[in-house]
């Protein structure tokens, strides 16, 4: 996500200072360290995307997940106050909505939060901290609840990239099995390049203190994503159910309503799912060839 956001901001003519743990050694859990880095950057706007993103892994690492996503967000918000940032975009996750009933779909921002995983609970805390920073301190925070995003460069810890990685590996090595976990969940998937457009528009036009869903407004089954990728494979392959890839608890359906975002910014998703998946598969073919 960060690579795509930086590229989009630079394409729009913005001056970008990127703080990334693996590059700069800045840890958002270390309050003095993140404050020093943010203050030194003298930002007018801050995009906070950092944190733990492994939903399934959060069951085994709940403490680490909460520290990264809740304490990390608090530290970033405090650093932004210290730096005098004019706008902060705090990105959480649609997982905060948890289990919803059919009559609650598509999910609006008014939907009650029912976190299921430790990851989701940590994002609820981050969302609340961002709201408190606005209400309590007047920090101009715009909150985002991002549904599933997908695009080139994404980690194979996520479903679609992991499927694409295995297909590309099979094409190279001669295998024909593609392991997969639960195929029934319905997800709302948006191309990451559309998502970063939404983020910049929200920094420009979003209302401080408000929260916005970033989503496509359409649901797609994991099985459908897998079938689309298999259709793009260079030769026949088959899905194989792998219990090790099953999450402890899986939310059956997440599909959002981006009406508020569209009304405020004029944003709409533009890149179709089949194009996104083709780009993801091409990315993995390139990675494995290199």
Predicted regions and their residues:
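C-terminal "lid/loop" region of Rossmann-like NAD(P)-dependent oxidoreductases
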Residues: 178, 182, 211-212, 220-227, ...
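Catalytic helix-loop patch of NAD(P)-dependent Rossmann-fold dehydrogenases
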Residues: 60-78, 82, 87, 96-143, ...
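N-terminal Rossmann-fold NAD(P) dinucleotide-binding loop
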Residues: 2-3
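NAD(P)H-binding glycine-rich loop region in Rossmannoid oxidoreductase-like domains
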Residues: 31-68
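Amphipathic terminal alpha-helices
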Residues: 273-290
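Non-catalytic, hydrophobic alpha-helical segments
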Residues: 195, 199, 214, 225, ...
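NAD(P)-dependent short-chain dehydrogenase/reductase
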Residues: 100-105, 131-188, 192-201, 219, ...
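Adenosine-cofactor binding site in Rossmann-like domains, unifying the SAM/SAH pocket
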Residues: 10, 16-34
């Amino acid at each position: 996500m960060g690579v795509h956001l930086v590229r989009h901001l630079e394409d729009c003519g913005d001056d970008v200072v990127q703080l990334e743990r693996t590059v700069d050694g800045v840890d958002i859990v270390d309050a003095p360290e993140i404050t020093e880095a943010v203050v030194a950057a003298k930002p007018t706007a801050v995009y906070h995307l950092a944190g733990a993103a492994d939903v399934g892994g959060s069951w085994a690492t709940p403490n680490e997940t909460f520290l990264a996503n809740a304490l990390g967000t608090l530290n970033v918000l405090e650093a932004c106050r210290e730096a005098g940032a004019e706008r902060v975009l705090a990105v959480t996750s649609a997982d905060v909505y948890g289990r919803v009933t059919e009559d609650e779909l598509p999910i609006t921002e008014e939907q009650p939060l029912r976190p299921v995983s430790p990851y989701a609970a940590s994002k609820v805390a981050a969302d609340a901290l961002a709201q408190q920073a606005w209400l309590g301190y007047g920090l101009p925070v715009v909150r985002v609840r991002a549904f599933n995003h997908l695009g080139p460069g994404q980690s194979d810890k996520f479903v679609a990239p992991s499927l694409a990685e295995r297909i590309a590996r099979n094409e190279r090595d001669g295998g024909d099995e593609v392991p997969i976990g639960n195929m029934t969940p319905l997800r709302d998937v948006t191309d990451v390049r559309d998502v970063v457009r939404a983020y910049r528009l929200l920094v420009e036009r979003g209302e401080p203190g408000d929260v916005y869903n970033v989503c496509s407004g359409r649901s797609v089954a994991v099985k459908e994503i897998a079938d689309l990728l298999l259709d793009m494979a260079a030769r026949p392959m088959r899905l194989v159910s792998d219990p090790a890839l099953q999450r402890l608890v899986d939310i059956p359906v997440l599909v959002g309503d981006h009406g508020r975002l569209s009304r405020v910014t004029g944003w709409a998703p533009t890149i179709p799912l089949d194009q996104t998946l083709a780009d993801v598969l091409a990315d993995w073919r390139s990675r494995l060839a290199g």
